[in-house]
Structures are given as structure tokens and as C-alpha cells.
Amino acid sequence: MKQKTFLSVGECMAELQARDDGLYRLGFAGDTLNTAWYMRALTRPQDVAVDYVTAVGTDPLSAKMLAFLKANGVGTRFIQEVSDRTVGLYLITLAGAERSFTYWRSSSAARLLAENREVLAASLSHADAIYFSGITLAILSPAHRR
């Protein structure tokens, strides 16, 4: 059987979650990343290539995200790099059992994901299946949502 390619398109964000000792744990998450993560867990690499399509910066946090994806079997070959941007960030705080989220994503490279239509189209042309969410479309400028 020929290997299939599954693409998840969107914004992976850095996540800061408060720990009991007052420090914060750094992780990476987001709806489209979570989908890629579980697709990788549910399929065999020889049967399905799972790749993430996004844009990141060239800063250390973006490099850490790329390393995380690679280490967990999520392909990065379709990830664009934007030199003057970084990745989005959110903070999770707890008030009792209630979680609240604070976002910093205005300088997220993923907002520019569709700026170069040719690069995005070339990435998508490799797919047998593509996943994106409403959030993926919402972070793009109105001109690039089509």
C-alpha cells in the first residue's frame, strides 16, 4: 500500500501552564496540532505521513516547537519560517476548578500562513486528507481566507 499523507493546517501555540510551585510549564498545543498528534498516535508511520502546515519564526521558541513536532513524529517539511515573527503564546490560569486563557498572538507567524499562496498550494497538493479548523481561518487576514 502506498503511504498516504495527512496534513493538519493551523496555528500551534506555545502554552504556559501554572504549576503548584509557582513556576510555569512550557508545552505546545492547539486544535490543529492536537489533531495531528492523535492522527500520528492512531496510524503507522509507514502507512500515513502526518505533516503540520503552519508558519513559525526563526527565534529559539519557534525552534523548540519544531524540535517538539519532529520528536513526536509530526512532519515539519511544510512549515514556513518568517524571520520577523514568532509563535503565538497563551497562558492558562486556574481559579478553583475554572481555567481561563490569556492569548498573545498578534505577532504569530501563523497569521501569515496564506500570504504566499503558491507555497501554501504546493504544500496542500501533497495531501490525501487535509484538516483545518475555523480558528485556522480566523487568524488569517480577510483577504487570505479564500
Annotated model-derived regions:
Residues 1-71, 115:
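Glycine-rich phosphate/adenosyl-contacting loop at the front of the ribokinase-like
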Residues 47-135, 139:
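Conserved N-terminal subdomain of the carbohydrate kinase-like
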Residues 117, 143-146:
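Charged helix-capping and loop-helix junction motifs
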